UniProtKB/Swiss-Prot annotation:
Composed of three domains: a modulating N-terminal domain, a DNA-binding domain and a C-terminal ligand-binding domain. Gene3D superfamilies: Erythroid Transcription Factor GATA-1, subunit A (3.30.50.10), Retinoid X Receptor (1.10.565.10). Residues 62-71, 448-458 have a biased composition (Polar residues). It comes from Mus musculus. This is Retinoic acid receptor gamma. Residues 90-155 bind DNA. Receptor for retinoic acid. Retinoic acid receptors bind as heterodimers to their target response elements in response to their ligands, all-trans or 9-cis retinoic acid, and regulate gene expression in various biological processes. The RAR/RXR heterodimers bind to the retinoic acid response elements (RARE) composed of tandem 5'-AGGTCA-3' sites known as DR1-DR5. In the absence of ligand, acts mainly as an activator of gene expression due to weak binding to corepressors. Required for limb bud development. A zinc finger (NR C4-type) spans 90-110, 126-150. Keywords: Cytoplasm, DNA-binding, Isopeptide bond, Metal-binding, Methylation, Nucleus, Receptor, Transcription, Transcription regulation, Ubl conjugation, Zinc, Zinc-finger. Residues 185-419 form the NR LBD domain. The lineage of its organism: Eukaryota, Metazoa, Chordata, Craniata, Vertebrata. GO terms for molecular function: chromatin binding; DNA binding; DNA-binding transcription factor activity; nuclear receptor activity; nuclear retinoid X receptor binding; RNA polymerase II transcription regulatory region sequence-specific DNA binding; sequence-specific double-stranded DNA binding; zinc ion binding.
Length: 458
């Protein structure tokens, strides 16, 4: 008999029309992904993005060519090739250096990390004492200390900016709509990502809204009825985010460990992005995927607490971008597939997978708004904002755990980076609460007599 974990990752288990497990679904990312035969049977759309073959001209670059002039009839000995240039080890992590980048000898990994950190204005946090050891093995564990080490050894911000300035001429030449023409490969990528997003997250116009009067007029510490409903919807949304990830080209070609790392790191970011795209400023409300619409006070009482105003402010900042479903899907994919996440086994492979997503969003956004070239960088900046909100969300979860009467729902626990922080030393009940058959039935009445629930998350 198949376990709950196997059903989640079995082919078609999350397809259209399938039911959801209740809020007590005992799912853990490592158990569900690592070594799960049904998961391994899934065939990704693009498994192992192959490296393009080198042009034939490149094959001869390392060989000293001989003269083929018809005037030279006497063969001459070829000149010996110059000895390979040897660089000092990477000043940051002591790995093999590929040359001098931004002022110091560095490897490709640290070069790319420093460039991305400066170009995206990334703000990192050290979870220890800001004195982590950075070497080839530990460099991906603390981004804050790695960036500080880059500065300490002499990497230059200005060198990164100057590198970007060299491309200004090329950017200026991109004045005609033809410059934003998408290649067939990018068109296909955009189609797949957009479809994956739309089929795991219906847009606001597709929903039949309904409201509740529960604690709508005044803020309280926690409305347990609203919390139960929100945690149920959040659980469903996490399942949908897993499905979205599995449908992204190349994602299942990553190692199982890296898939787990990326999902756990970005799940809360994507959940926040999704709910914020369903913000209605006229009523100051947010709508979930079953149509439930809550005002700001109710969102506070449902469990957001002190995080509420920050989330609503972010939702308001998204409005001027006027992102469509395709752009939201691409931004979600970029947020998920990011080589800067800690503890990745193959960050360079993840970066390689992210590059076409960045290019697709850049060209799509520019083609959609020819007179607004700044929209693409503004969208990317929202990823930094999302990470900040997610950090505060994890902190809120710690205090929330003390306010709810039972254990934190397991999927929400697994979404957070340190699930052990939710372990209760008291005598709280251990078994996960069982969901009623009414909750599990697609389209059935909820346990609180609410409107029919389609199989969607927030």
């Amino acid at each position: 008999m198949a376990t709950n974990k196997e059903r989640l990752f079995a082919p078609g288990a999350l397809g259209p029309g399938s039911g959801y497990p209740g809020a007590g679904f005992p799912f853990a990312f490592p158990g569900a992904l690592r070594g799960s035969p049904p998961f391994e049977m899934l065939s990704p759309s693009f498994r192992g993005l192959g490296q393009p073959d080198l042009p034939k001209e490149m094959a001869s670059l390392s060989v000293e060519t001989q003269s083929t002039s018809s005037e030279e009839m006497v063969p001459s000995s070829p000149s010996p090739p110059p000895p390979p240039r040897v660089y000092k080890p990477c000043f940051v992590c002591n790995d093999k250096s590929s040359g001098y980048h931004y002022g110091v000898s560095s490897c490709e990994g640290c070069k790319g990390f420093f460039r991305r950190s400066i170009q995206k204005n990334m703000v990192y946090t050290c979870h220890r004492d800001k004195n982590c050891i950075i070497n080839k093995v530990t460099r991906n564990r603390c981004q804050y200390c790695r960036l500080q080490k880059c500065f300490e050894v002499g990497m230059s911000k200005e060198a990164v900016r100057n590198d970007r300035n060299k491309k200004k001429k090329e950017v200026k030449e991109e004045g005609s709509p033809d410059s934003y023409e998408l290649s067939p490969q990018l068109e296909e990528l955009i189609t797949k990502v957009s479809k994956a997003h739309q089929e795991t997250f219906p847009s606001l116009c597709q929903l039949g809204k309904y409201t509740t009067n529960s604690s709508a007029d005044h803020r309280v510490q926690l409305d347990l009825g609203l919390w139960d409903k929100f945690s149920e919807l959040a659980t469903k949304c996490i399942i949908k985010i897993v499905e979205f990830a599995k449908r992204l080209p190349g994602f299942t070609g990553l190692s199982i460990a890296d898939q787990i790392t990326l999902l756990k790191a970005a799940c809360l970011d994507i959940l926040m992005l999704r709910i914020c795209t369903r913000y209605t400023p006229e009523q100051d409300t947010m709508t979930f995927s079953d149509g439930l619409t809550l005002n700001r006070t109710q969102m506070h009482n449902a469990g957001f607490g002190p995080l509420t105003d920050l989330v609503f402010a972010f939702a308001g900042q998204l409005l001027p971008l006027e992102m469509d479903d395709t752009e939201t899907g691409l931004l979600s994919a970029i947020c998920l597939i990011c080589g800067d996440r800690m503890d990745l086994e193959e960050p360079e492979k993840v970066d390689k997978l992210q590059e076409p997503l960045l290019e697709a969003l850049r060209l799509y956004a520019r083609r959609r708004r020819p007179s607004q070239p700044y929209m693409f960088p503004r969208m990317l900046m929202k990823i930094t904002d999302l990470r900040g909100i997610s950090t505060k969300g994890a902190e809120r979860a710690i205090t929330l755990k003390m306010e709810i009467p039972g254990p934190m729902p397991p999927l929400i626990r697994e979404m957070l980076e340190n699930p052990e922080m939710f372990e209760d030393d008291s005598s709280k009940p251990g078994p996960h609460p069982k969901a009623s058959s009414e909750d599990e039935a697609p389209g059935g009445q909820g346990k609180r007599g609410q409107s029919p629930q389609p199989d969607q998350g927030p």
